[in-house]
Amino acid sequence: MLQLLLSVERPVTVLGAGLAGTEAAWQVARAGIPVTIVEMRPMRRSPAHHSSDFAELVCSNSFGALSSDRAAGLLQEEMRRLGSLVIETADAHAVPAGGALAVDRGRYSAALTEALDQHPLVTIERREQQALPGDDQITVLATGPLTSEPLAEDLRAFTGRSDCHFFDAASPIVHGDSIDLNVAFRASRYDKGDADYINCPMDKEQYLAFREALLTAEQAELKDFDKNDATFFEGCLPIEELARRGEDTMRYGPLKPIGLWDPRWGDVNDRDVRRAKRAYAVVQLRQEDKDGRLWNLVGFQTNLKWGEQKRVLQMIPGLAEAEFVRFGVMHRNTFLESPQLLEPTLQFRSRSSLLAAGQITGTEGYAAAVAGGWLAGTNAARLARGLAPIDLPATCMSGALTHFVSEAPTAKFQPMPPNFGLLPELPERIRDKRARYGAYRDRALRDLERIKALTPNALVA
């Protein structure tokens, strides 16, 4: 019976094998539909990728908070319940990160690549796609914010609109054994969970000198943009941009010292000791791999020249002899003016057989890309079967994001990460924030249950 169905169903093409494309392709194959993944790497590299593996994490190695009463954690939990391969694999390759889901990015991407490569319904074509397929082909556009120029040009012609853009950056990574733990210390903020972070404390004099070095360091030249009109994503600002915004901006952002204490300083419960010893600012490093040999500087996205990165970052206490595995880089991210173009099903309004997913739609963050891939892949499979596409409830974090990108005001559409402000108000006002977020979570997961009957598994039952 399955062979008969496959003979009359339309195959699906997924353009791009990032987080969204990987998830979309898996959901199509999971439904019993043949799917072709077109990925330009390694034939053509992007400015930010370092390998040809699928779902390469080019910025942080963290998917955000694990707890489901946090926006990113709720989105992860929704994807787990909907059978996301990408989140399931992240759980399997997690590294210690306090209350966050962080992964060994090399093993993680390799595992996802292998899973798709070995699936009998998946065909992988390593080539650059330079134009959109015809409207007779069911296609998921998941080429991400680094879509190659020929395809981007064809997409502009198809939509009749110029794409939007912002500039994104990745943090440096250092060898763990080059960090001086006589100066730095292991701890998680407020001692939550295990001591999963390495913390480099600064006094006021060190902090001010470090900020001055950031302000005067030479930056790498970015191509194809007006330096006076550079647009950054507020959730991923370069550290030098934070330094420019004010003397204390970094201390209230990635360098905030609150909740971090080195036991060598004395008794944290002694008020006098705490006042005398507490750090003025703290740089945190998060484990990058399973073995704890590589560590990334949290919140240290940067566009400084590589030599300048080494000079300035080695001013951080504990990193004077740091050996850099990777320096930070910046790149231009392209996204669609989705509210003018997409339905909540992630189909293009002008071509129902073409769907979009991931960062190119204007969602921000790894978990959001996975959610878009899940929905686009599920709907591509349904279209291949001749079934109506679905959208996700706006009360779920995944649904709130897709409704935002398809329905937001378009005067100045900008990328949006998962956040509770996207969800409809609760019937009753709850003043306590944690209790309110818990109520949002409970409603979201309850409403998600009705969608589970429509996922690809049900299509082949």
UniProtKB/Swiss-Prot annotation:
It catalyses: uridine(54) in tRNA + (6R)-5,10-methylene-5,6,7,8-tetrahydrofolate + NADH + H(+) = 5-methyluridine(54) in tRNA + (6S)-5,6,7,8-tetrahydrofolate + NAD(+); uridine(54) in tRNA + (6R)-5,10-methylene-5,6,7,8-tetrahydrofolate + NADPH + H(+) = 5-methyluridine(54) in tRNA + (6S)-5,6,7,8-tetrahydrofolate + NADP(+). It comes from the Bacteria. InterPro entries: FAD/NAD-bd_sf, MnmG-rel, MnmG_N, TrmFO. One of its GO terms (molecular function) is flavin adenine dinucleotide binding. One of its GO terms (biological process) is tRNA wobble uridine modification. It is found in: Cytoplasm. Its cofactor is FAD. Disulfide bonds: none annotated. It holds the Pfam family GIDA. Its EC number is 2.1.1.74. FAD binds at residues 16-21. GO terms for cellular component: cytosol. Keywords: Cytoplasm, FAD, Flavoprotein, Methyltransferase, NAD, NADP, Transferase, tRNA processing. PANTHER family: GLUCOSE INHIBITED DIVISION PROTEIN A (PTHR11806), METHYLENETETRAHYDROFOLATE--TRNA-(URACIL-5-)-METHYLTRANSFERASE TRMFO (PTHR11806:SF2). Belongs to the MnmG family. TrmFO subfamily. Catalyzes the folate-dependent formation of 5-methyl-uridine at position 54 (M-5-U54) in all tRNAs. This is Methylenetetrahydrofolate--tRNA-(uracil-5-)-methyltransferase TrmFO. It comes from Parasynechococcus marenigrum (strain WH8102).
